[in-house]
């Protein structure tokens, strides 16, 4: 068995928001031909189907979600055999002081697990975005290079684990500081409308391939 399919046992304690969101998703179907946006608040806080003008896009984001949280609810999504799944998760794991290689390999493990549930689904993994911890996020202070290291490992594993790595980081980073550019955020972590517009433009080639 592929060792990456085995869970990495990262911390996972579902809160009330997670449970409510999962219970909501239980009433929403995923079908063949659908495109699923899967992940944390960065996924959840966007009306993807409207922004990308595609009614087949389904939002399966949960604020505060982690790699193991996504893994826990993945079967309900993959059992619908969607056409494509775009994953954005990991920044909340970074805030839990977990080593970058552990987080990155947990994401790779998640992707292998998704493949095992629906082999024909095309999988895409976004790079983690830069952030600016000087706003409200003390738990992310000093962890800028953790994100860089995670992205490097993900990119290195894309071919061998049959997923497409979607580079976002360099498009969102301020070239002078390396932090999330002020044009795309008001809190140093989450995105404004301009940020999501940029993200959508970067996704277009993958939606049509």
Q: What is each residue range found by the language model?
A:
Residues 38, 44-52, 56, 67-105, ...:
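Oxyanion-hole/transition-state-stabilizing segment in secreted/luminal serine hydrolases
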Residues 37, 57-59, 165:
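Conserved beta-strand scaffold positions in the cores of enzyme catalytic domains, especially
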Residues 100-110, 143-151:
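Charged helix-capping and loop-helix junction motifs
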Residues 118-122:
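A short helix->loop->beta-strand "cap" motif at the edges of active sites that frequently abuts
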Residues 1-36, 44, 48-49, 53, ...:
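N-terminal secretory targeting modules
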Residues 9-12, 54-67, 95, 188:
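Acidic/histidine-rich helix-loop elements
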């Amino acid at each position: 068995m592929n060792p990456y399919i085995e869970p990495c046992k990262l911390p996972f304690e579902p809160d009330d928001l997670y449970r409510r969101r999962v219970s909501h998703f239980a009433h929403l179907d995923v079908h063949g031909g659908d495109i699923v946006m899967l992940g944390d608040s960065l996924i959840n806080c966007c009306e993807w189907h409207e922004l990308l003008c595609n009614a087949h896009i389904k939002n399966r984001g949960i604020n505060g979600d982690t790699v193991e949280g996504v893994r826990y609810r993945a079967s309900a999504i993959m059992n619908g055999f969607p056409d494509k799944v775009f994953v954005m998760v990991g920044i909340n794991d970074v805030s839990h002081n977990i080593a970058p290689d552990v987080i990155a390999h947990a994401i790779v493990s998640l992707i292998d697990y998704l493949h095992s549930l629906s082999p024909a689904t095309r999988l895409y993994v976004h790079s983690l975005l830069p952030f600016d911890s000087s706003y409200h996020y003390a738990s992310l202070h000093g962890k800028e290079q953790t994100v860089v290291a995670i992205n490097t490992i993900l990119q290195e594993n894309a071919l061998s684990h049959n997923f497409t790595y979607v580079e976002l980081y360099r498009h969102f980073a301020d070239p002078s500081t390396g932090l999330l550019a002020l044009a795309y955020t008001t809190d140093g972590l989450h995105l404004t409308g301009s940020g999501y517009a940029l993200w959508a433009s970067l996704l277009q080639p993958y939606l049509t391939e």
